[in-house]
Amino acid sequence: MAEYDHYEDDGFLNSFNDSSQEEHQDFLQFRKVFLPCMYLVVFVCGLVGNSLVLVISIFYHKLQSLTDVFLVNLPLADLVFVCTLPFWTYAGIHEWIFGQVMCKTLLGVYTINFYTSMLILTCITVDRFIVVVKATKAYNQQAKRMTWGKVICLLIWVISLLVSLPQIIYGNVFNLDKLICGYHDEEISTVVLATQMTLGFFLPLLAMIVCYSVIIKTLLHAGGFQKHRSLKIIFLVMAVFLLTQTPFNLVKLIRSTRWEYYAMTSFHYTIIVTEAIAYLRACLNPVLYAFVSLKFRKNFWKLVKDIGCLPYLGVSHQWKSSEDNSKTFSASHNVEATSMFQL
């Protein structure tokens, strides 16, 4: 993203970087190829996956639980997030040509939707904890929880806007050999950066560790058809979050405390690679939080059938069989599926 672009430009970086000119040119060439390619992959996969989740959630799936409310807001945030990537892709290959207003706007949109996504993931984690550990209470208060869920989602968007204000205020277009959209980190206090990292990484991580630990303990003491599948999904969710988000946030933490690392070309490689890996969450969220659901996959095949693609895919018979199996499964495992599916 443009947050780091001006630190990787020739004129700015060479003013304090003691690495050789050749190394720096190699880095710039790598960055010019690597970031646009990664942005394009995330954009295409994120656009398709999150659009599917939104369409199915709105037109094929009734909002029957608090998780359903979150699963409408999560793909919306990720979808808007990935839609900013083509602008950063073009700017990475060429330069920023979209003006100062668009620079501030896209920095704001990018950041708002990033933190909205992470906070919603936190809420989904807590909701899963309540549904599994406090199943009876959660079921009895379903209507009340739905109302609170909508209020919580609204608050999340507002909080994300407030946390993103520094990027919007300090975002600007700089002329450093070429036009760059970004901001000077010196103008953003350590307190603000710490707040952003807390909401964007440490809070979701803490929620996952605490809630999933209790959920795992509960599942291990319970029997049932889906116990092992639910445990696998939990470990997968945790592993994906840690592998994609930890490296980039660790780099951001180092960046905020040890500025001398900017003198190392290798540190800049680390920044752009870990950043690209962190963005993969926008592609993986639809799989981890939607397509693992049997009901969601069933609605997906309904969508495919409605748009007339089913005969061309040659899966009409399989879809019919899957639908019958879904009905059988729902009839025999209704209570269990209600609580476990959301894992």
UniProtKB/Swiss-Prot annotation:
Regions of this protein lying in the Extracellular compartment: 1-33, 91-104, 166-188, 261-276
Membrane-spanning segments: 34-60, 70-90, 105-126, 145-165, 189-216, 233-260, 277-294
GO cellular component, one term: external side of plasma membrane
Annotated glycan sites: N17
GO biological process, one term: immune response
Places the protein is found: Cell membrane
Residue spans, topological domain Cytoplasmic: 61-69, 127-144, 217-232, 295-343
Alphabetized GO MF terms: C-C chemokine binding; C-C chemokine receptor activity; C-X-C chemokine receptor activity; coreceptor activity
Recorded topology in the membrane: Multi-pass membrane protein
Domain of life: Eukaryota
CDD domains listed in its UniProt record: 7tmA_CXCR6 (cd15173)
Chief localization: membrane
S-S pairs: C103-C181
Gene3D superfamilies: Rhodopsin 7-helix transmembrane proteins
Keyword entries, A-Z: Cell membrane, Disulfide bond, G-protein coupled receptor, Glycoprotein, Membrane, Receptor, Transducer, Transmembrane, Transmembrane helix
KW Membrane (keyword) present: yes
PANTHER family in alphabetical order: C-X-C CHEMOKINE RECEPTOR TYPE 6 (PTHR10489:SF705), CELL ADHESION MOLECULE (PTHR10489)
Family listed: Belongs to the G-protein coupled receptor 1 family.
Role this protein plays: Receptor for the C-X-C chemokine CXCL16. Used as a coreceptor by SIVs and by strains of HIV-2 and m-tropic HIV-1.
Name of the protein: C-X-C chemokine receptor type 6
Organism: Macaca fascicularis
